[in-house]
Amino acid sequence: MISAQNLVYSLQGRRLTDNVSLTFPGGEIVAILGPNGAGKSTLLRQLTGYLQPDSGECRLFNKPLNEWSITELAKHRAVMRQNSHMAFPFSVQEVIQMGRHPHRTGNQDNETAQIMALCDCQALANRDYRQLSGGEQQRVQLARLLVQLWEPTPSPKWLFLDEPTSALDIHHQQHLFRLLRQLVHERQFNVCCVLHDLNLAARYADRIVLMQKGKVIANGKPQDVLTQQALTMLYGADITVLEDPANHSPLIVLDH
């Protein structure tokens, strides 16, 4: 479980998170949605311990984040940021194996190879990471995070992803979310991601959090949260919300 209680964070007089309280029980894919500047990435950084709130508290497995050591926290949660540039000529395989650093147990070549296959990175193994496309880099970073969290026996872990599909083609978007769902069901992973694609969130997320101006304005199942009224108010766009006949999830269409 991860929880946030009364999170407040301000920058240059502007509240980026404004008294945010949330509890994610686990066993879910959570999608945080909202317009640009809503506070989504700021909230994610606070939930992961990268950004200390001005007031309020975050807890992971009922323990305050500031009471975790850096090493132990890294074994239980992993974070993909929006940008993951590197200045040095590491190979893809070397980048992925960096994920094992908190465990100090060597490279674990078998697990690394398994995870590279899961993330469709085998063909990239010997490439210079800096020469990859944005989408290829996102796949490599996901593999690094899984190597960081992987244990021989599945145990609860948290995976935080900030716009993980921003550079992915449609095939790899689908592959990513199918993999995340598999990890939730088979490996006791919990996933929290910031997204802009409303239809991806509607199709794959178990829980949707809507943010506006630093506040959480809705939190619940996609069919309860992604309504035409709520989305029109939030984004100021002319849209129609239909029902996907395949799975009864919301289907968001931009009007002409």
Swiss-Prot record:
<comment type="function">
    <text>Part of the ABC transporter complex HmuTUV involved in hemin import. Responsible for energy coupling to the transport system.</text>
</comment>
<dbReference type="InterPro" id="IPR027417">
    <property type="entry name" value="P-loop_NTPase"/>
</dbReference>
<keyword id="KW-0472">Membrane</keyword>
<dbReference type="InterPro" id="IPR003439">
    <property type="entry name" value="ABC_transporter-like_ATP-bd"/>
</dbReference>
<keyword id="KW-0547">Nucleotide-binding</keyword>
<feature type="binding site">
    <location>
        <begin position="34"/>
        <end position="41"/>
    </location>
    <ligand>
        <name>ATP</name>
    </ligand>
</feature>
<dbReference type="GO" id="GO:0016887">
    <property type="term" value="F:ATP hydrolysis activity"/>
</dbReference>
<dbReference type="InterPro" id="IPR003593">
    <property type="entry name" value="AAA+_ATPase"/>
</dbReference>
<dbReference type="InterPro" id="IPR017871">
    <property type="entry name" value="ABC_transporter-like_CS"/>
</dbReference>
<protein>
    <recommendedName>
        <fullName>Hemin import ATP-binding protein HmuV</fullName>
        <ecNumber>7.6.2.-</ecNumber>
    </recommendedName>
</protein>
<dbReference type="GO" id="GO:0005886">
    <property type="term" value="C:plasma membrane"/>
</dbReference>
<keyword id="KW-1003">Cell membrane</keyword>
<keyword id="KW-1278">Translocase</keyword>
<keyword id="KW-0067">ATP-binding</keyword>
<comment type="subunit">
    <text>The complex is composed of two ATP-binding proteins (HmuV), two transmembrane proteins (HmuU) and a solute-binding protein (HmuT).</text>
</comment>
<dbReference type="Pfam" id="PF00005">
    <property type="entry name" value="ABC_tran"/>
</dbReference>
<feature type="domain" description="ABC transporter">
    <location>
        <begin position="2"/>
        <end position="238"/>
    </location>
</feature>
<keyword id="KW-0997">Cell inner membrane</keyword>
<dbReference type="GO" id="GO:0005524">
    <property type="term" value="F:ATP binding"/>
</dbReference>
<keyword id="KW-0813">Transport</keyword>
<comment type="similarity">
    <text>Belongs to the ABC transporter superfamily. Heme (hemin) importer (TC 3.A.1.14.5) family.</text>
</comment>
